[in-house]
Amino acid sequence: LLARPTTKEAPQLANLLIVIAYVAVMLGIGYGCMRRSGTVSGFFLAGRNLGPWMSAFAYGTTYFSAVLFVGYAGRLGWGFGMHALWIAAGNVLFGSLLAWWIFARRTRRMTARLDALTMPQFLAARYQSPFLRLAAALVIFVFLVPYTASVYQGLSLLFQSNLGVSYEQAIVFMALLTGVYLIMGGYLALAFTDFLRGLVELVGVVVMVAFLVHLKGGFTAATTALTDPHAAPALLPPLPGKPAPMFPGWVTLLSLVFITSFGPWGLPQMVQKFYSIKSEDDIRRAMIVASLFSVFIAFGAYYTGALTHLFYGADVKSFLTAKYHLPAGKDPLDYLMPDFLTTKVPAVVSMTILLLVFSASMSSLSSLVLVSASAIAIDLYAGARADANSRSVVALMRVMCGAFIAISLYIALNKIDFIVNLMALSWGAIAGSFLAPYCYGLFWPRATKAGAIAGMLSGLLTMLWFVETHKAPGNPAVPVASALAMLVPVVVVPVVSLFTKPPDAAHIKNVFG
C-alpha cells in the first residue's frame, strides 16, 4: 500500500488530486448557497438577483456543453473542415449576441409582470391557457432526457487517460457531484459554479488551440493548411456516410447553423437566464460578456475539430474502429475528439482539456436537470394544487433533481450513442415546440391561445413524424428535420391567430404594460 507510485500512476495521482480540489470547491459553493435557496424563486431563479457576469457565464456554459467539444467539434469538424466555422459564427451572432439583445429585456420585464418563473408558466399566463402549461411541462420533461444523457458521452477516454478510471465510474462520479451541489444550492449554486467552470473552459480552449496549432507550425500555417481543398470537404455533393444522406452537404450545414443558433431562442434552459438577471441595466453588459465567451468557446471548439484533418488520414473511421474495437453500428467519429485530445497532447494539456470537458458537462447537466425538475414541481404539482406552499414545492424540486439525474445516468450507462443527432433531436422537439409561441408571445399582441397551441403541436409533430418515418436518431438528416420543426410553427402561429378570436384587450394591456 505504501509502495512508490509507478511512472504512469504518478501523473494520474496528481491529476486526481486536482480533480478532488475542484470537486471540493463545487461542493463548498453548493453548501454556501443553501440558505438562499429556500423559496421557489430563490431555488429556481436565485431570487432574480444575478449580476451580468454570473448571468452571462451561466448562459454560455449551458449553451456550449461537452456535446460541442466531443460530438459536434469532432464529427462536424471532420465532415466540413473549416466550413464548420460558419456554425460558430452563427452561434456567436444569433445564439448569443442577438438572443440577449432582442429577448433579454422583454423577457425579464414580462415574466416579472406575469409572475412567471418557468417557460410553461409564461406561456400559460400570456395566452391564458392551463393546457399550454401542462403540455409545455410534459415536452420539457420528456425531450430533455436525450440531451441530458448525451452530456455524459465522450468523457470515457479522457478520464481513462488522465485518471485511470472507467467510463462508468466517471459518469457516476459526475452525476453524484452534480446532484449534491444542485440539490443543496439550486440555481444560485449553479450560477456560481458556472462562473468558475466558465473560467476553466476559457483557459482550456486557449491552451488546447495554442498547443495544437504549435504542432503544425503556428496559427497561420495551420489555417493555411486547412484551407487546402483536400482538407476542406466539399459542400455541394452529399456528404459520405451510411446510411446514404438525403441532402447535399451545404443543406445539412445550413440546418446545423440554424438549429444551434436560433434553437436557444426557444430552449427553456437558455431563456431561464433572462428571467434571473438582477435588472434591465445589467443586460447590456451580460450581452457583451456572453458574446465574447461564445467567440472563444465556439470558434475554439470547431477550429480544433477542423484541425483533425492535419493529424489523421482519410481512413480515420477504419483506424478508430480497429483501435477501439468498435462494434458494427457504432459511429467511430464519436471517438475522434477523445482520441485526438488524449494522444496528440502532453499530460498537462490533456488534464486541462479534461477539466474543460468535465466543466462543460456539469454546466449543461445542471441546467437541464433544474429546468426538468421545475416542470414537475412548479408547473405540474404546484399548477394542479392551489394550496401547495413554497416549502413543499422546493422539496419536490430537490427530489426531482435527483430523480432526473438518475434517469439520465441510466440512459448513459446503457450506451446511448449518436451524440450529435441526440442533441439535434432534443433541440428540434423542444425548440420546435416553444420558439414560435414564445417569440410571438413576447412581441405580437395579436397572437392567440389557439395559435400558440397549434404552433406548439405543429413543431412537435413535425419532429415526431420525421423520427418515425426516417428512423432517427441514427439518420444524418435529423438536423434538417429539426430545422423544419422550428420553422413550421413560425408560419402556423400567425396564420391560426389571424383566423381565431383576438385575445382579451384588458389582458393584453396588462401583459404588455
Residue ranges and their predicted role:
Residues 31-32, 67-76, 82-83, 144-158, ...:
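Transmembrane helix-loop junctions in multi-pass membrane proteins
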Residues 4-71, 182-185, 198, 217:
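Membrane-interface "cap" regions at the ends of multi-pass membrane proteins
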Residues 1-7, 375, 470-513:
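Terminal cytosolic tails of multi-pass membrane transporters
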Residues 125-134, 141, 377-416:
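Loop-to-transmembrane helix boundary motifs in multi-pass membrane proteins
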